[in-house]
């Protein structure tokens, strides 16, 4: 109700997805307002259900798409497990333990790139390259600015970065052959 009212929405800077979430069974956990119950009391009365990567991504990306001028954070159930979903959905402050300074500098300058598949999500920037979170073994044609790139793999659980190809020349696009699910970083050099 607040975000649909332009006057009140103007004072909202951050959308915090905390007290509701999509469930893996396709339903929504959303306690009714005005019941004078704390979130823990609602959780005793209504089954909370589980939220997976896909559900976290959906929530963040929907709000970022609908309200592009607002920061979106997710602190719902098991939020530390959904850092990649928050990042790939365009959210702010994802909980990720990637210890690569170049990655941490590049990612905030990237934007969500809409794709017509659930096989992967992508964020990219002309000067930074692209990050893809891939869920299926497949070949992906990634549109990129012409230049030199390093192809890196980031383990989604440990956030360890490993170099697959250190120096590759790209002209307009790169064909990424996915040999294992996870996060691929095409780092512009």
Outline where the language-model segments fall:
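Aromatic- and carboxylate-lined catalytic core of secreted/periplasmic carbohydrate-active enzymes
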Residues: 40-52, 58-73, 79-165, 177-189
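Short acidic-hydrophobic, aromatic-tinged amphipathic segments that line or gate anion-handling sites
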Residues: 168
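Glycine- and acidic/polar-rich repeat regions and solenoidal domains
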Residues: 16, 21-53
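Short strand-edge motifs at loop-to-beta-strand transitions and within beta-strands
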Residues: 172-174
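Substrate-binding cleft/loops of secretory-pathway carbohydrate-active enzymes
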Residues: 1-29, 80-91
């Amino acid at each position: 109700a607040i975000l649909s009212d332009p006057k009140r929405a103007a004072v909202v800077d951050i959308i915090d997805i905390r007290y509701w979430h999509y469930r893996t069974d396709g339903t929504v956990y959303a306690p009714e307002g005005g019941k004078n119950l704390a979130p823990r009391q609602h959780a005793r009365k209504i089954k909370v259900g589980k939220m997976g990567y896909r559900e976290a991504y959906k929530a963040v990306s929907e709000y970022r798409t609908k309200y592009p001028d607002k920061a979106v954070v997710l602190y719902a159930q098991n939020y530390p497990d959904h850092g990649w979903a928050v990042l790939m959905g365009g959210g702010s402050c994802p909980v990720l333990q990637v210890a690569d300074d170049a990655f941490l500098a590049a990612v905030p300058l990237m934007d969500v790139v809409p794709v017509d598949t659930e096989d992967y999500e992508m964020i990219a920037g002309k000067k930074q390259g692209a990050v893809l979170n891939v869920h299926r073994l497949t070949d992906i044609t990634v549109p990129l600015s012409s230049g030199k790139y390093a192809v890196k793999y980031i383990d989604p659980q440990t956030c360890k970065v490993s170099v697959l190809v250190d120096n590759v020349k790209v002209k307009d696009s790169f064909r990424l052959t996915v040999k294992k699910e996870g996060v691929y970083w095409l780092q512009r050099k």
